[in-house]
């Protein structure tokens, strides 16, 4: 539990109350996300996080019990939960934009997440896992849904080229999911040799170290996806598309980060910049489907796992990023 910024405690708390329409899930695995580190550091806008906070919006587990009104899940079912606990009633939810729910509530930010051993979630955000999908892979469904929604908004056609700027977890998932669109080529751009090696392993046709500032295929790519969350990354992303190309910004959001790009670069080259945040419940379901069908494999993206009590080591690894660091998992015992 993060009591307040920079202060973490291990504490026994009462078992969360499982309401009639809720599911009580025993968390087995939780992914360490850059956003979790921002919550610990107090860098996230207070509109989106409530302290004390039990993080963990990327996680998977097993049903412990269900509320009286839940008929289609049972104890022992393997499940994964969407982070956004959307209301299903507001204007945005009725339009299918569940990620923009007017009653913002999110596991791991405003209610207890998968770093805790027991999590309560509304039935509508709980998905039973198909037999073929492992609990490890299920942890990555949340960030994969963020990526897939961004790709769908960019509308890549078969035979087009896709550039991926940044090859952390989001970038690795973008390389993986981009193959679903039958691209002519996927080019991954990064600044660390180890991460570029992982991108190649995941199916990138070409990788480019851009630490020196130069990048191949400038002005040549059909679709570019920015995943790095750094100002230089979005600046590079605006140089890569062809005239009429599309740019999806997935990682750049955050306090103090600004988009400062010459207007002519957009206007005179007819570029489209797409901001994409989160995922809808419909996109989440599609990620589960492609995993179950064996069309994608997330297992190579998981590179490290720690017992939950060693979360500090996991956070340190994510921050220092020595060697190949993909998704880092925390594992609950028992």
Annotated model-derived regions:
Residues 87-165:
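NAD(P)H dinucleotide-binding glycine-rich loop of Rossmann-like/cofactor-binding domains
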Residues 4, 28-29, 68, 84, ...:
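Short, surface-exposed secondary-structure boundary micro-motifs
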Residues 14-30, 44-91, 130-132:
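Glycine-rich beta-strand-centered segment in the early N-terminal region that forms part
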Residues 246, 260-300:
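Rossmann-fold dehydrogenase core element
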Residues 235, 239, 281-334:
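C-terminal hydrophobic helical "lid"/dimerization subdomain
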Residues 133-212:
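Mid-domain Rossmann-like dinucleotide-binding core that forms the NAD(H)/NADP(H) cofactor-binding site
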Residues 154, 181, 197-272:
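Glycine-rich cofactor phosphate-binding loops and adjacent beta1-alpha1 units
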Residues 189-192, 227, 251, 277:
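N-terminal Rossmann-fold cofactor-binding loop
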